[in-house]
Amino acid sequence: MELTLHEARVIGCLLEKEVTTPEQYPLSLNALTLACNQKTSRDPVLDLSEAQVQDALDSLNKKRLISEQSGFGSRVVKYKHRFCNTEFSELQLSSAAVAIVCLLLLRGPQTPGELRTRSNRLHDFKDVLEVEACIKQLMERDKPVLAQLPREPGKRECRYTELFSQGAEQISAASFTSADAHPLNEQDRQQLEARVTQLEEQVAELKDKLDSLIASLS
């Protein structure tokens, strides 16, 4: 499965709205266009026309990833996904996995902490450990659907990307290339170790001062 940026946005929106606003699902072309162009919870923010969304829908229909539905007495065509968890889908995911994949389709690479914070309307993760466990399962499938990106400089957590879209594959390849192209040399490593040691000493000093202050107040 390989999705364009527009196709990934359409699938992500259908997954999202199926969970967050089930009373409005399936979505009309107009509602889907509005969802694709939301200013919040989207990265990148897009400005798609209805014609562009329709093109993406037509392409997804050929890939058998969406289906059309029209209500009795209504001429408005509505769309629902066949991306996962339907009788026509090869991909079967838990609600937790759907939430993670949906967020990655809509907002690009994210850390487990970001995924937990942003998933409250899609799935109730108890903590980051639960997010990490779900990510691990998705990466260990026979056909992995997520990939871990190299840790960015100055960041504590690694980001993860979905493997359904062309953009995600390019990000993954570029990140690993960048990481391989700029390894730490010996001088950089020594400077980094010295800086870490200095910070550890400062933390220890502050802890001693705090302990002394607490003792004087007790």
UniProtKB/Swiss-Prot annotation:
Pfam families: DUF480 (PF04337). InterPro entries: DUF480, WH-like_DNA-bd_sf, WH_DNA-bd_sf. HAMAP family: UPF0502. Belongs to the UPF0502 family. This is UPF0502 protein Shewana3_1622. It comes from Shewanella sp. (strain ANA-3).
